[in-house]
Amino acid sequence: MPWIQLKIDTDNQHADTLSDLLMEEGSLSITLEDGKDTPIFEPTLGETPLWNHTVLTALFEADRDLSIVVDNLKLQPFLGADFSYKIEQVEDKDWEREWMDNFHPIKFGERLWICPSWREIPDPEAVNIILDPGLAFGTGTHPTTALCLEWLDSLNFDNKEVIDFGCGSGILAVAALKLGATKVTGIDIDYQAIDASKANAERNGVEDQLTLYLPEDQPENLKADILVANILAGPLRELAPLIAEKVKPGGQLALSGLLQEQALEVAEFYTQWFDMDEPAHKEEWSRLTGIRK
């Protein structure tokens, strides 16, 4: 069944009101997108931010007369008669198949591959992780996850224990175990992340070596030879003492989730405990690494 969609340029002040009006006009779904590729980082608790320039897309059944919808919208004072819009036909597709076709195996470093379950493994002799896109946690496609995976691929994990601080999907924890770590502890504030990490560890046959905790449940004096934290600049600054105390002397640290302009400032929070390396960059993102003093 074909569809028709109405695209409207709006702003963060009127996006919600416009969404409600379009639903009243019979829209089947509303999508809000950034109109100018403006990133949003670290919203405050309970905040659902929108972009200053927002593109709203309303999907309708193909037989809906959108000229009537547009005429009704022109009566709204915040839009007026000359508001910008576009009407497009939407071809009916097998959306699930189209979505799956967008994901392919990705190589990180010299040994490590992340492979969707429906794809053939490119190199059976490599270190392969089976991971499907799902919850809004890392799958390797984001530059910060890629930076962490490349760093993990470069390490020697013989007799090493690892902490994945902010484990999300568990991709970094599973990678460390597949690369040879003896044990990984994953910590996350989100119980859905704990469930996702557990499921991905089971899928990859490393669940017996992975222990998962919410922060309030983690053991006292938990320490590891290697700690990786792919979270955000704010928590990395705030939690620097806690993160530092979890790394054994001589242990290795990697921090990501940072924009390039945040990297050096965040690194300063760790220099009293770590000998920090120069940041590594991918696109606008950075990774910090260091050795515990």
From Swiss-Prot:
Documented EC number(s): 2.1.1.-
Assigned protein family: Belongs to the methyltransferase superfamily. PrmA family.
Gene designation: prmA
Stretch forming the signal peptide: none
Gene Ontology biological process terms, A to Z: methylation
Main localization category: cytoplasm
CDD domains: AdoMet_MTases
Reactions catalysed according to its record: L-lysyl-[protein] + 3 S-adenosyl-L-methionine = N(6),N(6),N(6)-trimethyl-L-lysyl-[protein] + 3 S-adenosyl-L-homocysteine + 3 H(+)
Chain sites annotated for binding S-adenosyl-L-methionine: T145, G166, D188, N230
GO cellular component: cytosol
Lineage of the organism: Bacteria, Pseudomonadati, Pseudomonadota, Gammaproteobacteria, Alteromonadales
Keyword Nuclease: no
Localization annotation: Cytoplasm
UniProt xrefs under InterPro entries: Ribosomal_L11_MeTrfase_PrmA, Ribosomal_PrmA_MeTrfase, SAM-dependent_MTases_sf
Catalytic class of the enzyme: transferase
Name of the protein in question: Ribosomal protein L11 methyltransferase
Single GO MF descriptor: protein-lysine N-methyltransferase activity
Pfam families associated with the record: PrmA
Keywords tagged on the record: Cytoplasm, Methyltransferase, S-adenosyl-L-methionine, Transferase
Main function: Methylates ribosomal protein L11.
